[in-house]
Amino acid sequence: MIGLNHYLIVSGLLFCIGLAGMLKRKNILLLFFSTEIMLNAINIGFVAISKYTHNLDGQMFALFIIAIAASEVAIGLGLVILWFKKYKSLDIDSLNAMKG
């Protein structure tokens, strides 16, 4: 039987993979993907704890995180597309070219 520890280990590993992606990558699109992996890892942890404590709070938090992640993707990808059209690069180092 799969216990709470197994879910939390998978959640922790996914979060570490997402964090490593955030720290290592210089591509804006890959940073978005890494953020999504981290948010999904948090969702797995919330839902697993919610199931084993018979409390729905974790599942409600997971739904809020899914909604926030969807809005992040919609707005973020729109900005990435505009950035690529203007600068022809998705490299983080090109962010220094911003003037404002």
Curated annotation (Swiss-Prot):
It is an enzyme of class 7 (translocase). One of its GO terms (molecular function) is NADH:ubiquinone reductase (non-electrogenic) activity. Its EC number is 7.1.1.-. Gene3D superfamilies: 1.10.287.3510. Keywords: Cell inner membrane, Cell membrane, Membrane, NAD, Quinone, Translocase, Transmembrane, Transmembrane helix, Transport, Ubiquinone. It holds the Pfam family Oxidored_q2. It is a multi-pass membrane protein. Disulfide bonds: none annotated. The chain crosses the membrane at residues 1-21, 28-48, 64-84. It is found in: Cell inner membrane. It catalyses: a quinone + NADH + 5 H(+)(in) = a quinol + NAD(+) + 4 H(+)(out). InterPro entries: NADH_UbQ_OxRdtase_chain4L/K, NUOK/Mnh_C1-like. The keyword Signal does not apply. The keyword Cell inner membrane applies. GO terms for biological process: ATP synthesis coupled electron transport. GO terms for cellular component: NADH dehydrogenase complex; plasma membrane. NDH-1 shuttles electrons from NADH, via FMN and iron-sulfur (Fe-S) centers, to quinones in the respiratory chain. The immediate electron acceptor for the enzyme in this species is believed to be ubiquinone. Couples the redox reaction to proton translocation (for every two electrons transferred, four hydrogen ions are translocated across the cytoplasmic membrane), and thus conserves the redox energy in a proton gradient. Belongs to the complex I subunit 4L family. NDH-1 is composed of 14 different subunits. Subunits NuoA, H, J, K, L, M, N constitute the membrane sector of the complex. This is NADH-quinone oxidoreductase subunit K. It comes from Helicobacter pylori (strain P12).
